């Protein structure tokens, strides 16, 4: 199994005492007056949903701030509604969160996965509220991801879909018979075996390249008995280390994982809520997400759009505002909280696009000039409906060893237990 065996033990969360509190993450302090600027991800009076965009050119402190946000979320689990545990899945394209960064692994108790025998099954049918013909939907989603990355044609797409359906049938799973769906689902190795043994299928095209990549690299676990639910796997911080792999392989892994995550999210219970507070269950962080976002994979947008109901938030980190796209590729409409560091190629239209300032030229110009002039570990923050504010960041290195959370505003520092 690819789980790092010697990852740091996850910090223990204090048991919930029944009091509903606000989870609080300190972005930093306002440059203007030093006041704390915070994010309240479970308080719907502050942010309707917890999706966030973090932007900044290389070297501006973007990764340090992102690590700080993740670490603080881990430490704030005690304030989650009902004391629900919080899982955070990180797609790490550059190796900024893996075992070569022991301070982060130690602070968060992160487990690191490498793309070898990943212990989940993209053809799994697990869940408590499953849609009709679920095996067909699952097979079609996997096929669509492969087709997008490897530019498959209609015939190749149909061929792959047929192989997956045949694999389900070989496992005794019938698409129209929900009573069969709890049987062990086929693994990718079983799908590949059906594909490779079918002499009628052409083997020198882009479909072959895709199947061969997945099989030769042994990315997915081939033994169904050694796989688990992805939702169950994402407990605490889980880092998927994609560094050193080709872009096609990286995007394929992220696409397959997000599609499975979305399916299992949809098949799970809605998160609890009480008045203004909503239970958070999981976060997804896609680091250096621009290449993946450009391919418009449906699962990412669906998670952004529908995750709130299930207590799921998404954090997208990129180097440019324009990576959030426009038209069919518009991700900005799903983001309520923005952290913008210095951006080297910033345009005024980028500011209007993200901050919706086209009707307020004065504010747009202020933001444009502010983003262009801020220094390292400084950012412009817009959280929910609050006005944008320029802050001195709270980077990860400042809080890594401060498990008492003394960096929080005084009213939010954890109470000392009674003697």
Which residues does each predicted region cover?
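P-loop NTPase motor domains
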Residues: 12-17, 32, 57, 68-312, ...
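A short helix-turn-beta junction within AAA+ P-loop NTPase domains corresponding to the substrate/partner-engaging
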Residues: 108-113, 329-341
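H-loop/switch region of ABC-family ATPase nucleotide-binding domains
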Residues: 318
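Conserved P-loop NTPase motor module
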Residues: 1-6, 194, 252-253, 369-419
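Basic- and hydrophobic-enriched, low-structure N-terminal and domain-boundary segments
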Residues: 1-60, 64-65, 69-80, 298, ...
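Conserved AAA+ ATPase core "coupling" helix
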Residues: 346-354
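Conserved AAA+ ATPase "sensor/coupling" helix adjacent to the nucleotide-binding pocket
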Residues: 353-361
